[in-house]
């Protein structure tokens, strides 16, 4: 691509370590696909906009410039949350926490029996976790201000609540986690839950297939819950993570590329994807699911609210990425080499730069 030879359609999500999609966003190198939403799905009578579930083309993940136009098509959605061994909790007689106070109580009970409360595959998995936490702490208004780096937002009570919860959770995390929290060894952290060496981990529905062949404790069965409410009676949130497909602005066959993107939402394509465990964000898709997936995709039917969106894009700043500023320091919080205040100070400093370079 550096030589100017672009594929017509790219399926590559944001949030990857190499941040290729983010580079294309920051460089304004992605084609506007707003008109695809009004196209008729090839071979069908419905328009693309009539098939995609509500809200999925109204977020900063699909409309990164805040100009009301869609540049990235939502693909393969997955409700994210805290995954656990439901069989182990049943065996112990422990209830799934619905508030963070209940979570800390459970952490103390588990510690007394030799099990840690928490682990995580890599710090990258804190994106969905932190987004849902921000919604739980302050609702959509706080989330929107925070993800646009509003001046003073990290000094608010809602922000402090988020920082305090993550820092406290770090103290309940299996200490081996940071050493394995990389792209080569992350499944070893996921294995901690299967072996009852940690109760909860943030993850997405793909975890079942990813760990399908892994050994597990007797009586293991997957469970998934939304993030606990900040206080009793508060809302619990589950972040909906989804991948993105997009068309490079330099694509040679732009019209054909748009037709192909429209086809990705056809019943035929959705069925093919679902056979591989990839679920398109189209209306009514959960009706056709069974087993673990039916449980996972019904999380919003069980009282959890959906959180969507992410940090606003900004022009390239050397050495500054959302993940390195907000999420990577969690490893150091767990190991004790970084304090909560150092983490917060880093976020404030970087947010000033991000705000100054935000892509409007």
Predicted regions and their residues:
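Extracytoplasmic/periplasmic substrate-binding proteins
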Residues: 22-23, 115, 129-133, 137, ...
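Hinge/lid segment of periplasmic solute-binding proteins
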Residues: 17-79, 104
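Early extracytoplasmic/lumenal segment of secretory-pathway proteins
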Residues: 1-20
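Short, solvent-exposed loop/beta-turn-alpha elements that line the ligand-binding surface or hinge
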Residues: 31-52, 138-161, 213-217, 229-237, ...
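Mature extracytoplasmic/periplasmic domains
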Residues: 32, 206-213, 227, 231, ...
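Glycine-centered hinge/linker elements that transmit conformational signals in sensory
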Residues: 106-110, 148-181
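Extracytoplasmic/periplasmic solute-binding protein
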Residues: 60-75, 80, 104-152, 189, ...
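C-terminal capping/gating helix-and-loop segments adjacent to ligand/active sites or protein-protein/ligand interfaces
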Residues: 147-148, 238-239, 279-284, 298-355
